[in-house]
Amino acid sequence: MIGRTAGSIIAVALFAAAAGPVGHEDTTLAVRLPSGESRLFWRASRAPVQWTAADVRLIGLVTWHPGQPGVEWATLPIAGHGEAHALTLVLARLDPRAMSFDLAWAIEGDRPAWTIDRAGDAALALNAGMFVERLPWGWVVMNGRERLPPGHGPLSSALVGLADGRLVWVDGDDVSTWRGRAEGDVRFAFQSYPTLLAGDGEVPAALRDGSINEAHRDARLALGLDRQGRLLVAMTRLDSPIPGADRVPFGLTVPEMAAVMGAFGAQHAMLLDGGISAQLAISDSVGHAKEWKGLRKVPLALVARAGH
């Protein structure tokens, strides 16, 4: 027998599939306003090749809520094309000066084992990196020790956490500068792909010239760093009243997710494993967890706690 939640998810998936794929028309992203109208903030035919600052009009539509010290979070209803016609963006901003970060490794019985149910008292927790079979892809450093060697790919990025609490972003797959310091200055590190923004908010050419699949839609989870040094998180969820249907892996394209991160002020950004892996927990100001669950367990998570 199929459970109620699973049945609901299947029903939504079949409905979206029946709508058919979206072609390469001039796609857009807009905020869905309470009035029923929408406010456009991105169009593919006019997409910036570089985001030098946040979109102040878009930021003005976001109501930020306090989480634990150092964390703000928000949700924003948006509309894209096709199956992305009704999505919710889940957003978070973290001040590393008020946080401590750790990676959680979870392989049990040769299988991934982490979900946000293990987040405990974390101020924020989410799946980290990209996953290949049962393991994270690429470089993983935990507690100053290298757990996995670096991966190589032109569209990869890395987040490095230093022993003094600072965060360093690495564009590209060359982590040699930091790898040699893994048992000293580096407390944790992980890689992921594809890169969404690099340098000073530049959209990689591969996201603009057709080198990647620009039409594929999926539930997305992205991580970035803004010019104030804050860590940015953005997740897409299907906006549906059907219980559990928000976890259906429909959402934005990779170029659209780059636009989301750029519009919210990211200077650097990368995707994390999305689809059925994407999951996020945020503890509000009184310690109650806001949870966006995934559909499968993962081997690696980034966990942030208030204080050092």
PLM segments and residue spans:
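Conserved, well-ordered active-site substructure
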Residues: 135-154, 161, 208-272, 276-308
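A short, polar/proline- and glycine-enriched secondary-structure boundary/capping micro-motif
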Residues: 111-115, 178-183, 242-251
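Conserved hydrophobic/aromatic beta-strand scaffold that supports enzyme active sites
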Residues: 89-93, 195, 222, 301
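Extracytoplasmic
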Residues: 87-89, 119-121, 191, 218-220, ...
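Short, solvent-exposed aromatic-acidic interface loops
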Residues: 105-111, 174-177, 235-241
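Active-site-adjacent helix-turn-beta-strand microarchitecture at beta-sheet edges
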Residues: 127-215
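Bacterial Sec-dependent signal peptides at the C-terminal "C-region" and cleavage site
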Residues: 3, 10-27
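Zymogen propeptides
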Residues: 19-158, 166-169
